[in-house]
């Protein structure tokens, strides 16, 4: 049985423009035992979070040559290929052949396939090397006390909310949604050992 670490996993997406029209397909490839980090993928594509979703595989197949669970980085066309930065350093991997019930073995980056974008798009696991310092990553529970949603021009375009740039040209306002959880922030502070005892706060 083949170890998942020796396989390439494909995830297929469709992207949209600011008006909600389909704007091309994306095939993201990661090591078989890894999980995709959508935030990293969105940043790599330089698009907004709302501008991408999983593709209708049958529809995408007609346009790009992908085949459901048998999609690999070879024989794809008319789509952007994003390869996780871990894959180029791995040798002799197994990947889908874009043909039902068929796979390729001994796949190597550069010789057999390439990506339009090669960047870190995986979710780090406990024990993985930190991409900044190299130390093993350790997971810990946290409390979300704030959040940001990048809305881009999703609402400003249809609302015609424009501003004048330095050339006096109308440009859509880039919007965001920002939240701070005041009550949960206080709760998190109180939960810290130095901020409460058996008598309370």
Tell where the protein language model's regions lie, with residue ranges.
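Extended, low-hydrophobicity, polar/charged segments
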Residues: 1-185, 192-201
């Amino acid at each position: 049985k083949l170890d998942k670490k020796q396989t390439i996993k494909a995830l297929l997406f469709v992207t949209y423009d600011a008006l909600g029209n389909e704007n091309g397909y994306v095939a993201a490839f990661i090591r078989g035992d890894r999980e995709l980090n959508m935030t990293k993928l969105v940043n790599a594509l330089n698009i907004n979070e709302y501008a991408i979703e999983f593709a209708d595989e049958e529809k995408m197949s007609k346009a790009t040559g992908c085949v459901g669970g048998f999609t690999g980085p070879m024989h794809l066309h008319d789509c952007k290929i994003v390869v996780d930065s871990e894959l180029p350093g791995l040798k002799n991997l197994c990947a889908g052949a874009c043909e039902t019930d068929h796979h390729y073995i001994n796949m190597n980056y550069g010789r057999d396939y390439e990506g339009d974008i090669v960047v870190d798009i995986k979710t780090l696991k406990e024990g993985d090397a930190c991409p900044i310092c190299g130390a093993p990553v350790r997971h810990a529970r946290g409390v979300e006390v704030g959040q940001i949603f990048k809305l881009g021009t999703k609402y400003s375009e249809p609302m015609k909310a424009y501003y004048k740039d330095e050339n006096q040209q109308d440009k859509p306002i880039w919007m965001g949604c920002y939240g701070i959880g005041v009550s949960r922030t206080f709760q998190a502070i109180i939960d810290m050992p130095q901020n409460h005892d058996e008598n309370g706060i």
